[in-house]
Amino acid sequence: MYETLTYSGGIHKGNEMRELIEDLGGFIIQENIIQMDLVINMAIPVDDVDKIKEKSDELLGKITFAPMAGTEIAIVSPTLARHHLPHAACDISEYLRRYGAKDNMIGLARGHGKGTSGISQEEKYLIEEHDVAIFALGSFKDCIIKKSFLYDDIDIPVIVTGAPEIDVDELPGADAYVSGLGRIPRRLKRGENIRALKKLVETTESILNKKRKYMGEDPPLAPSILVKDAIENQVPAIKEAYTPTPVTSQLDGVRVKLDYDTYHKDIENVDVNGRKLSDIADITKSHMYGYTLVKLLNESSIV
């Protein structure tokens, strides 16, 4: 079992932390250098967490638990127009990233308006490529309830946010509802906003833990972080990809930000513990920019 952590410190002697992660059999999920600061999201064997903490103290850094690291979350807004963005949804996105999440903003083509909103099948397919979807809706209870058709048949856990208090049973298809996050024409910096964001983090972590527990009953044939590491080491084109996190971990697979038509053969032939990746995963064309989506097969699939 692995524990996901975030290391925050200076870039001086950062290589010592990277080398320790590798020596312990861990994996770097994501690494960011911001001026003189280094932030590393990592997965470490549970028994070795104390060693990472000791090294962090030695380097005058900080270690925090990052339960969302290694997941990809969709934050869905009814539209990209200022009517719904940028404020609440963007602050939700930024806040989740503090806890290790990799999130993507998705604006529906015609999701605005209580009586005119809609969602296409293509948009649903894109949302379902993620681990969890957060639908950032508005401030009116009746409008939020009537827009439940946007997500009632989406095949991943769905969290809905809005301003009023609503019982989740009134929202068909939603796994959870978090209030206090409607349309707010400013940054979410006030006390009640921060409390609502913290509640959203707790709710998201709870749903991800439930999904992990469910997957544990029939786990993937290989951990997604192991597959991520294998692809990064065996597909040379990854080093030439300038997108953020060119191989993005998910609970049940990875998103490889390389063109499927050009590179899918290289990805299919990646060796993972002596087996071709194509033998232990479904490798398909993503609905996001034509990237390559790898979804790992469960152990029961080979019985």
Give residue spans per PLM region.
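Helix-enriched interaction subdomains in cytosolic or periplasmic regions
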Residues: 24-55
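C-terminal, charge/polar-rich interaction regions
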Residues: 245-303
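Short, low-order "capping/linker" segments at domain edges
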Residues: 72-95
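Short amphipathic alpha-helix segments
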Residues: 8-29, 52
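Generic non-transmembrane alpha-helical segments
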Residues: 16-24, 55, 59, 95, ...
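Short glycine-/aliphatic-rich beta-strand segments at the starts of folded cytosolic domains
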Residues: 1-9
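Conserved short beta-strand edge segments in small beta-sheet-based binding/regulatory domains
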Residues: 5, 27-33, 54-77
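Long, charge-rich C-terminal accessory regions
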Residues: 92-95, 99-261
